[in-house]
Amino acid sequence: MALTDYKTALVTGASSGIGEATVRALSERGIQVYAAARRKEKLDILAAETGCTPVVLDVKAKNAIYSTLNDLEIDILVNNAGLGKGFEALFKANPDDIQTTLETNVIGAAHVIRAVGAGMVKRNRGHLVNIGSVAGLYPINSSVYGSSKGAIHSMSQNLRIELKGTRIRVTEICPGRVATNFFNIAVDDPEKSAKAFEGFEALTSEDISDAIMYAVDAPWRVNIGTIELSPTEQTFGGMEINPAPE
C-alpha cells in the first residue's frame, strides 16, 4: 500500500517546520491533506499555496480533537504537533511547562491517534506516522521532554502489536537537531537558541518529510518501524563519569 493507494492525510503541527514541509510533500504527490494547527493565519497561507484543507486545532483540547476529527476518513496520520518546554532539570522545571509538554506531546498525540485510528481500523487501511525524537531513545539531560518522546517511542511499538492482523502500518520518525523554530520556543532566549546550532549543519524540515515519504511510499508488505536521523556531526550515547565528592 504505497502513496498511490492513499487518498487523504492529516498532519498536526502543520503551520511551520516539519509539519509544513510534510503538508507540501504530500500535496505535491496528490494527497488531499488536512493541515491542523493553532495558527489560522499560517494555515490559510499554506492552503492557498498547496490546496490543503486548514483545520484549526489545539491538540491539548481533547473534546475539540474528537468533534473535529472523528468524521474524517484519514489514510495517513502524521502526528507531528509537539513542543519542548521544560528542558531544565525536572526539579527546576516550571510546573506549567511540565504540564504543557506532556499534554501536547503525549496526551494530545494519543487522542489524535484514537480519533483517527478507529476509522482506519474500520476501513482496514492506513499509516500512522509518529514524530518522536532521538530524545526518546537516548538520555539527553532533559527528563520532561525526553520522557514525553520516550512515551511516543513506546506507544509506536505497542501500536504495532495492537494493530497486528490489520493493513495499518506504524512508523516512528526520530530526528536529531532540526533547523526549525523549535528551540526558539523551547528556551525563549534567542542567544541560547542560536548556540544550539553552532559548529555543525543541522537537519532541515525537508530531510524529515523525505523520510516520512520514504516510509509511507514503501510497498504494503514493508512496515518501516523506526527511522532515526541526526546531523552527521551530532552523536549520542557518550558516557560521563563524575568524580565522587570528597
Model region roles, listed by residue range:
Residues S133:
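Residue(s) in the substrate-gating loop at a strand-loop-helix junction
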Residues A118, I161-K164:
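Alpha-helical segment proximal to the catalytic Tyr-Lys
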Residues S15-S16:
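Conserved glycine-rich cofactor-binding loop
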Residues E172-I173, E191-G238:
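C-terminal helical subdomain
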Residues I113, S148:
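Active-site helix of classical SDR
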Residues E88-L90, D97-Q99:
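Substrate-binding pocket helix/loop in short-chain dehydrogenase/reductase
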Residues A93, P139-S147, N158:
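Active-site loop-to-helix junction immediately N-terminal to the catalytic Tyr of the SDR YXXXK motif
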